[in-house]
Swiss-Prot record:
<dbReference type="GO" id="GO:0005829">
    <property type="term" value="C:cytosol"/>
</dbReference>
<dbReference type="GO" id="GO:0005634">
    <property type="term" value="C:nucleus"/>
</dbReference>
<dbReference type="GO" id="GO:0033260">
    <property type="term" value="P:nuclear DNA replication"/>
</dbReference>
<dbReference type="GO" id="GO:0005635">
    <property type="term" value="C:nuclear envelope"/>
</dbReference>
<dbReference type="GO" id="GO:0051445">
    <property type="term" value="P:regulation of meiotic cell cycle"/>
</dbReference>
<dbReference type="InterPro" id="IPR004367">
    <property type="entry name" value="Cyclin_C-dom"/>
</dbReference>
<comment type="function">
    <text>Required for pre-meiotic DNA synthesis and S phase progression. Regulates levels of meiotic intragenic recombination.</text>
</comment>
<keyword id="KW-0131">Cell cycle</keyword>
<dbReference type="InterPro" id="IPR039361">
    <property type="entry name" value="Cyclin"/>
</dbReference>
<dbReference type="InterPro" id="IPR036915">
    <property type="entry name" value="Cyclin-like_sf"/>
</dbReference>
<dbReference type="GO" id="GO:0016538">
    <property type="term" value="F:cyclin-dependent protein serine/threonine kinase regulator activity"/>
</dbReference>
<comment type="similarity">
    <text>Belongs to the cyclin family. Cyclin AB subfamily.</text>
</comment>
<dbReference type="GO" id="GO:0005815">
    <property type="term" value="C:microtubule organizing center"/>
</dbReference>
<keyword id="KW-0195">Cyclin</keyword>
<keyword id="KW-0469">Meiosis</keyword>
<dbReference type="GO" id="GO:0000307">
    <property type="term" value="C:cyclin-dependent protein kinase holoenzyme complex"/>
</dbReference>
<dbReference type="GO" id="GO:0023052">
    <property type="term" value="P:signaling"/>
</dbReference>
Amino acid sequence: MNSNNKRVALQEISNYVSKSLNVKGWVNAQVREISLQNGCSPSDKHFPSQSWHGISSIEESQIQKDYDSFLASPLEEEIVFTEKQLLVDLDVCSISNVQSPNCSVSEFGIAIEESNDNCAEEDEEEELQMRYSADESVSVEYAKEILSHMEKLEIRFMPDYRHMSAQPYYVTEMRASVINWIVGVHTCINLLPESLFLSINVLDRFLSLQNVPASKMKLCGATALFIACKYEEIHPPTVKDLEIVLEGEWIGEDICGMEKYMLMVLQYQLGWPGPVSFLRLLTIVNKWESQLRIMIKYFLEVSLVEQRFSSLRASQLVATCAYTGQSILQEENWSNTLPQITGYDYMSLVSYVHLLLKCLENPFDHHYAIYSKYATPYFHGISRQVHDWIATNTNLMAMDGS
């Protein structure tokens, strides 16, 4: 296999970051501070019972309802998932300067195309295959089967959000700091995006099955990244590399021991497709420009820090980030392509868009490492652009979702 081959659809989205950023040092300090604060009696610190900050009680209920609606045992039940039709209307029912009577406008100002049975459907499958062919890594003839299989796996390998939300409050705080630390390490080592998302999935699934003390959260995070790299990377980091980034807190024997234990708990099942696979598919079909793709990638990484997003499927998370990105960039329409491929319309995503916007309000406290990474020229300073947009659109941020 040629390691120099690039994925055409996402070739500009790598993990480059300026070496001048002291990401690891800042995150290490955060982890140590939270460990000291919660090391004495963490058991009595639980999530507050009031509504989640930043979204309404209706949206809070909707998030839990959406999670419960597709919850299934990954080990005992066969998930039956109907294949979604990939045929899309790419050149019909387009939005012109004069809005079509078949369009509605969302609260974010995006024109939403409604279905029209009279629209022409000429050569849709051929057009879709041509767009798939733009990326050599896509097997066109098996596209529908691959997507159907991915949809099954994304549910099968979801963490148990209800168990995670019942954990002591210090676990949530430590998780956020550890994820910021993982992002910093992942960026410095220059790993694939898939490795980052899989590592958080491994960590969350482990946390939903085991109670982890604060003192071992960082070890679990490093081990989750180690496992994900072995699964995704051609040249994964070594145990010695992890010892260096852990700065002597844990030795190789500790890492290997935790690796064995985590894999045993997870029953060696690591086939989660992750959001990058769905993002690549939607990028090809929708011909998204570089700015929107990078912005979606930024939102996906921000969502890793917020535990409430672990209740979403990978495809649902990508759809949420895509809608938010289109809102900020003032894209002209929310086409039928994304709902037909992912199965989510914009109305089913509004609650999660509000939550994402709330997370983006204060990047320096919520996701400093990710903000710093995407503030670099390599990523077109996309995080600063988003922060400026939020600062000048306080009316959107004040919406309660009603």
